[in-house]
Design a protein with these regions (language model features):
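Collagenous Gly-X-Y triple-helix signature in extracellular proteins
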Residues: 1-172
Length: 172
């Protein structure tokens, strides 16, 4: 935590990139290192993010036929008292997208959830149990909230000792 290197060694920070104390989604290592939602760390996705993805990311694992039709999305998060916009191909949902709260940040509730869609996610394994899943947050101090195994929002770091899943979205 709070470290970075100049020799190419990765120091994965769940909340932000490198030693920058900025918890906005735009600066979250997960966007680049795991999701491949952008191909420039800490920056907006470029037009080649989907067609020339960062190696060993979720984006690179998607079929090329899907990646070629994917479209970027403008994502809104909160940092240091202001709205931060980022351009992403595989973002995580925000609590407002699911529960309809905090719409002042331009995050809208998706019709699927507005119409009663499930907020519980299941493990992709033989027991198919209900699991925690990560969301973008609008907090100044963390980059993630989670949905608990009960389908309810849990804010902040209480969950950091639990294993959580991710359920990114994309647009075609």
């Amino acid at each position: 935590y709070d470290s970075d290197s100049t020799d190419g060694t990765k120091h994965f920070n769940m909340y932000h990139s490198g030693s920058v104390r900025n918890a906005s989604w735009k600066n979250c290592d997960l966007r680049y290192d795991i999701l491949g939602s952008t191909n420039i760390k800490g920056e907006n996705a470029t037009l080649t993010t989907a067609t020339n993805p960062v190696a060993e990311t979720l984006m690179s694992a998607l079929p090329s036929d899907l990646r070629v039709v994917m479209k970027p999305m403008t994502i809104y998060s909160w940092s240091n008292g202001s709205v931060v916009e980022s351009i992403d191909y595989l973002p995580l949902l925000a609590p407002a997208n699911i529960f309809g709260d905090n719409v002042a940040l331009k995050n809208k509730q998706y019709d699927y959830f507005k119409n009663g869609g499930a907020t519980k996610k299941h493990a992709y394994n033989k027991d198919n149990r209900i699991v925690y899943w990560g969301l973008r947050t609008n907090s100044d101090s963390v980059a993630f909230d989670v949905i608990t195994d009960e389908g309810k929002k849990s804010e902040g770091g209480q969950w950091t000792t639990f294993g959580i899943g991710i359920a990114p979205i994309f647009r075609v």
